[in-house]
């Protein structure tokens, strides 16, 4: 096979690869082969898949080239492909909202959804650096190449940061027996990670939320958005009936957890709440223990209704006015429609239509290193 034919064969295989990371993965970029033996390279390659994002990572003092190259292939980077002007900002809460931009030159609408973090397997998560998107207001410009949002693992030069620069020492001592590493003081506080947890709470018609987050003046069964859970408890649910109601629904009893209560455990700060129900909101409790659930549901529906109507109006006028919109714009509009479409019914994983109300609480927690955490240097 000639060199020309070999090049054609290589290019053909490259074009058949679906994702950019299929061509060159992090294990191929990370190591400097001339400075590491084969066993260590294999070990490091296997460990890369188990790395978790840490709080405030640092750029390595001795880079490999991997750190900057990865930015071209990272999935948690949202780079503007055109010059957009912000035409709308529709918010659900301080952690979740949608920015809509318009490129007058190409006549294209695009949308970005602001998210606090992305949840991975086993509850580990990566936070987004939302400084730029949080600064945007209607009328602001988004230039081509601007990173609208990105993982906090990247610095301002778009170098991927996956660890910390710490002082270690190699010596003969019981502390470093086998694979032990003797490191500087304070290391245990430098490698905090973030954990995301999604808690799903079913609430039947004969159940109420215990008043764990309220007081004698107001009733609050779950933490509000931005608040932290108390003592590792998200909420407690109490089943009521005509026989037990006179005692179990007294105000002082509703501020205490009883043995028969169903408890939802979880730690962290609430970054979003969803209320999933097929009930007519007019029939949802408007007073008492579950009033907050109805209020959250009405606020949620108003957000999705405003978002969908705005985006749908743009979509309906696209052909007549000669502009278009991106796939991401369509996806966000479709998600909003699912919440307000009267023909849509929420169902569980077995496709059983909800007969109850489900409260979905998204938590973000900061976790310290503990005994048993794997630390690689």
Where in the sequence are the language-model features?
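Long, charge-dense accessory insertions within large macromolecular proteins
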Residues: 1-376
């Amino acid at each position: 096979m000639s060199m020309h034919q070999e090049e054609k064969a290589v290019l053909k295989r490259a074009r058949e690869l679906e994702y950019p990371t299929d061509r060159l993965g992090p294990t191929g970029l990370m190591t400097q082969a001339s400075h590491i033996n084969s066993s260590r390279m294999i070990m490091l390659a296997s460990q890369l898949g188990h790395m978790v994002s840490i709080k405030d990572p640092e750029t390595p003092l001795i880079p490999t080239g991997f750190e900057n190259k990865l930015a071209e292939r990272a999935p948690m980077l949202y780079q503007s492909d055109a010059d957009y002007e912000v035409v709308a900002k529709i918010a659900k809460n301080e952690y979740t909202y949608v920015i809509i931009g318009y490129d007058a030159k190409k006549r294209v609408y695009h949308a970005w959804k602001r998210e606090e973090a992305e949840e991975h397997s086993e509850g580990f998560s990566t936070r987004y650096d939302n400084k730029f998107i949080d600064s945007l207001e209607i009328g602001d410009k988004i230039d081509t190449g601007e990173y609208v949002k990105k993982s906090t693992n990247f610095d301002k030069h778009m170098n991927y940061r996956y660890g910390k620069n710490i002082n270690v020492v190699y010596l003969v001592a019981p502390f470093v027996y086998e694979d032990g590493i003797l490191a500087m003081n304070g290391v245990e506080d430098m490698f905090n990670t973030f954990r995301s947890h999604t808690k799903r709470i079913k609430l039947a018609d004969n159940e109420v939320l215990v008043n764990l987050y309220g007081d004698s003046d107001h009733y609050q069964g779950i933490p509000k958005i931005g608040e932290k859970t108390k003592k590792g408890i998200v909420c407690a649910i109490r089943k009521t009936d005509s026989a037990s109601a006179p005692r179990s629904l007294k105000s002082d009893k509703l501020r205490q957890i009883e043995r028969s209560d169903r408890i939802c455990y979880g730690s962290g700060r609430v970054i979003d709440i969803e209320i999933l129900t097929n009930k007519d909101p007019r029939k949802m409790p408007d007073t008492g223990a579950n009033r907050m659930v109805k209020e959250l549901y009405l606020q949620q529906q108003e957000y999705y209704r405003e978002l969908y109507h705005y985006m749908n109006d743009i979509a309906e006028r696209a052909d007549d006015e000669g502009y278009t919109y991106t796939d991401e714009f369509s996806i966000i509009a479709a998600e909003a429609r699912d919440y307000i479409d009267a023909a849509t019914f929420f169902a569980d994983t077995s496709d059983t239509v909800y007969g109850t109300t489900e409260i979905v609480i998204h938590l973000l927690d900061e976790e310290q290193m503990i005994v048993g955490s794997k630390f690689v240097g």
